[in-house]
Swiss-Prot record:
This is Chorismate synthase. One of its GO terms (cellular component) is cytosol. GO terms for biological process: amino acid biosynthetic process; aromatic amino acid family biosynthetic process; chorismate biosynthetic process. Keywords: Amino-acid biosynthesis, Aromatic amino acid biosynthesis, FAD, Flavoprotein, FMN, Lyase, NADP.
Amino acid sequence: MTLRYLTAGESHGPALVAIAEGFPAGLPVDFEAVDRDLRRRQKGYGRGGRMKIETDAAQFLAGLRGGVTTGAPIALAVWNKDHENWKDLVSPYARGGRKFTQVRPGHADLAGALKYGLDDARDVLERASARSTAVIVALGALAKALLSSQGVEVCSRVVAIGPRDIRPDAPPTPAQRDAIEASDLHVDDEALAAEWRALIDAEKARGGSIGGAFDVYATGLPIGLGSHVHPDRRLDARLAGALCGVQAIRAVEIGDGTQVGRPGYEFHDAIHHDPARGFWRETNRAGGLEGGMTDGMPLRVRAYMKPIPTMLHPLATVDLATRAATQARYERSDVCAVPAAAVVGEAVVAWELANALLEKFGGDTVEDVRRAVEAYAARIR
């Protein structure tokens, strides 16, 4: 069975909840590792006041016993502390408070309200909020655990804030990963981080916001995850879709995908083989994916995040109730959330990779998966 999940919950509701199905039995789950990823999502220079209220932690409700998966569906919740401050406005049992009609450009407010016949965009923005990514990160931590059990590791790095970017061509080393995790901008270059902080400070001072980009990497992937036979089975398409499903992500690049001005001999990766290493490449311009499948090299995927559209200096809009011109309503938000988005990016990439791994190797238990992976590795060497 492959993986699937369903989530529910609103930004200021009681909790965000999820049910995940398809994890093999026998997978140890490090609860602290799950909560550590949730804390990582809350970090980052430029975050707003909400992160000072929440102390995110996952509560597992089903599907594990003694910290190990049983093969049954996994249920979990991430509780919203801030709900106490909003319970009179956002409640499953009553409606109250001022209606949200000054819809914000760049958000789901207008289209969602019109689509569902709503006179209050609150019902749209509560679900559309990036707060929902907290439970996605918890699910992603489970996917990371499954991948790690088979020798696959996932990490990320912020590579752009505003116009100032970098283009590393390899996953970070262990020392670089330590520096990235210690950085409030999720990067291993403190001089660059200082430049980025200045850009964020400037946008905050003028009531604006700023976007950027991040890379997600995966190492240890076997050749052949994904498929070339149908568009919806191509792993590059699935990864791009998963990343574009994250709030504010507007573009995705696989490997050196945007560098199409190069001639072919500078764009593709020559193939080599030796008995000890198997198939290998000197370069990784493809970012670990060819023909919709992993090629054995590290995965490198870049996601581009737009500036958050909720700003203290708002754009012009139209009031949903009166159709009169007005200013977009301000709702507590971040100036920059690219470091947090990188952690969410890890989660959705890990989920797609774990899904592809189980599609390829199956298995009702983690040991079944391990044996299938080892047999396949021996066959293709």
